[in-house]
Amino acid sequence: GNNTPRYRLNSNLGASWKGFDIRALFEGTMKRDLWLGTGSTGIFWGYYGQWWSTLNDTHLDYWTPENPNAYYPTPTNTTRSRQTQTKYLQDASYIRLKDVTIGYNLPQAWISKFGIAQLRIFASGQNLWEATGLYKYLDPDATGNRKKDGEMEDRMTKYPFCRTYSFGINVTF
């Protein structure tokens, strides 16, 4: 796998019509792989490779005689089943609607009598949508290991971007 994205995507789209305007910013990466090794993330394998330290709903899909096609191996107190293999190579490509703003400029006839040159009302949202093939509890912007003093440093435990909504008024006198 290759943790360096082969392609980066950014698109800033905008349109306006009869006082209304909309702007949307998309960003993402394509062709990026991510190996979640034994010590790389507590969310995927459990902290320090111990599955019981962070049990979540996906960890319940482990091998048993009744579930031979499970995603995870049988939970054990060893790392033997969690060796490097393509089964656990994650697709870290994504596309995200990073920002969208919708606004309306009130007509001059309505606002000029109040000494206002321009009045714009808007609503904005950040991180409203994302599509990724990555494991569901990981944020593609916060993933990837890097070397720190010769050792791999965990970057999987960072908080993901928050979804934010804003409303406002711009007034020009």
Question: Across the structure, where does each feature detected by a protein language model lie?
Answer:
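Short sequence motifs at beta-strands and strand-loop junctions characteristic
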Residues: 3-6, 87-96, 159-162
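Membrane-embedded beta-strand positions of outer-membrane beta-barrel proteins
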Residues: 24, 121-123, 169
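Extracytoplasmic gating/loop element in the C-terminal half of outer-membrane beta-barrel translocons
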Residues: 29-120, 125-126
